[in-house]
Design a protein with these regions (language model features):
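Membrane-proximal interfacial segments on either side of biological membranes
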Residues: 1-95, 112-204
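Short beta-strand segments that buttress and anchor functional surface loops
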Residues: 1, 97-104
Length: 204
């Protein structure tokens, strides 16, 4: 069984070269080098065609890759998401069409986004998800962490940033069995912010 089949051509006179790569059940973990920072622990198998060609110092990539039984973890949230669908790649971006995703306990949501890059450096990403009672935060207790806990949510999530900064915007409500812990230091700082108020539940 051939996991990867490669065919290529080189034209010395013009310094042009091209590779046609067919993937058949390639370990998705190979992408960890490029996705580390916004995704971690990628797992699953990849199928599809990848064209890589270039001339002089220029390199272009075109690919449509089907990921089967794929799982990706968002390290900032500690949550792992699962899907089987096709991802599109070219020389400047990785495009994820709207696809169905599942959490570790089988709850369903949707996910889409785009990751841009400069020859696979200087990554920027804009990722969106709609979740329905999904496990969106799953961080173990850590006295050094700003927050931790296990949170199930329904609503919308946006993660955007680059190699150096990450911003997470959430418009969602928590569901049953959610437990969220905020460190004392973080709570003190947050209380002094004009846009955050901590309130006690009305027990009257």
């Amino acid at each position: 069984h051939k996991v990867v089949q490669v065919q290529g051509k080189v034209i010395p006179a013009t310094r042009w070269w091209g590779l046609d790569i067919t993937c058949d059940s390639v370990d998705i973990g190979l992408i960890d080098f490029w996705t580390n920072g916004f995704f971690s622990n990628p797992q699953g198998r990849a199928y599809g065609n990848l064209k890589v060609f270039g001339q002089e110092q220029q390199v272009w990539v075109l690919a449509d890759v089907l990921g089967k039984n794929t799982q990706l973890t968002v390290p900032q949230l500690g949550s792992t998401f699962y899907f089987s669908d096709t991802i599109h790649m070219d020389s400047t971006s990785i495009r994820i069409p709207k696809l169905d995703v599942y959490d570790a306990v089988g709850n369903k949501g949707t996910f889409e986004g785009i990751i841009t890059h400069d020859k696979f450096t200087n990554f920027k990403y804009d990722l969106n998800a709609h979740v329905d009672k999904m496990l969106v935060l799953n961080l173990p207790p850590d006295p050094q962490a700003l927050f931790y806990g296990k949170v199930y949510g329904t609503g919308d999530l946006n993660i955007h940033g680059d190699d150096y900064n990450c911003k997470i915007a959430v418009n969602a409500k928590t569901e049953d069995k959610s437990k969220f812990y905020l460190s004392v230091n973080t709570a003190s700082i947050a209380t002094s912010s004009s846009f955050i108020d901590f309130v006690s539940p009305d027990t009257s």
